[in-house]
């Protein structure tokens, strides 16, 4: 049987990425051009800057992916692209590039939801067993998703305000840490103790919603008041206390979801899934359900995860027309229960 190759494009935020998937789950290449250095001085992603960077490097990423995989454009059977959620200008660059490649080679165009991509990144780690529960944690999203079968998603809980990754970056900025702050906070937390009392919003309530704005505000107020009084705060203990509160919230809601929905496994994915503290808590706290987490290289935004999600859509012949457009606030295919 002839091998099938899907080329995937990801440009929803500040990473330009092109990957090539062989058959169902073999990633041949996953080119990522990061813009982190360009956005550090702003303390966050500037949409217009991100879009311009995508334009500058996307063509090179295409060629690098083909070269690294040892393939020609004519070998590609389909093109997948993230069409939301994300920054509209950034998304449009990837969509335009994917359309051009698909049109030039007369091959199908596969639309992929960015968050479905994060979830399906776990496919490279292990074959997924349905039904499953997914905890998706990133800079823009915090969601619990029930997945009864491949390609069907039901959001059963989400954040009411800040995403968990956003909270990390905001408190990191207050402490003067470099953007993005998640990794540094995680490292500092492992050197400190949970000595500061931060709130765990809605942790005892039965619903599956998250909230991190109160925790973020409590952290900022504590830091501000200490500065006003000239008090010294222990940075490592601050990070340890903040992270302990975050993880308590995430684990409490995840356990409630697993109790309500019988599943075969728990997938934890998204940029925050790279957090070592989270991985340690999952290993110690979730013992009756198999936990699957993508490898570190597939936790952040990348086209490899888009390709892995696209393979499922390809089998369903879920192709887009040439009128495919960016949807910045794109939701999962199913309505929230």
From Swiss-Prot:
EC number(s) given by UniProt: 2.3.1.234
Gene Ontology MF: a single term: iron ion binding
Localization of this protein: Cytoplasm
Domain of life according to the entry: Bacteria
Sites where the protein binds Fe cation: 114, 118, 301
Cofactor info, note text: Binds 1 Fe(2+) ion per subunit.
One Gene Ontology term from the biological process aspect of the record: tRNA threonylcarbamoyladenosine modification
Keywords associated with the record: Acyltransferase, Cytoplasm, Iron, Metal-binding, Transferase, tRNA processing
InterPro entries noted in UniProt: ATPase_NBD, Gcp-like_dom, KAE1/TsaD, TsaD
Cofactor section: Fe(2+)
GO cellular component: cytoplasm
Catalytic activity: L-threonylcarbamoyladenylate + adenosine(37) in tRNA = N(6)-L-threonylcarbamoyladenosine(37) in tRNA + AMP + H(+)
Enzyme category, top tier: transferase
Residues where substrate binds: 136-140, 169, 182, 186, 275
Function field: Required for the formation of a threonylcarbamoyl group on adenosine at position 37 (t(6)A37) in tRNAs that read codons beginning with adenine. Is involved in the transfer of the threonylcarbamoyl moiety of threonylcarbamoyl-AMP (TC-AMP) to the N6 group of A37, together with TsaE and TsaB. TsaD likely plays a direct catalytic role in this reaction.
Assigned protein family: Belongs to the KAE1 / TsaD family.
Protein name stated in the entry: tRNA N6-adenosine threonylcarbamoyltransferase
Phylogenetic lineage: Bacteria, Bacillati, Bacillota, Bacilli, Lactobacillales
Name of the gene this protein is made from: tsaD
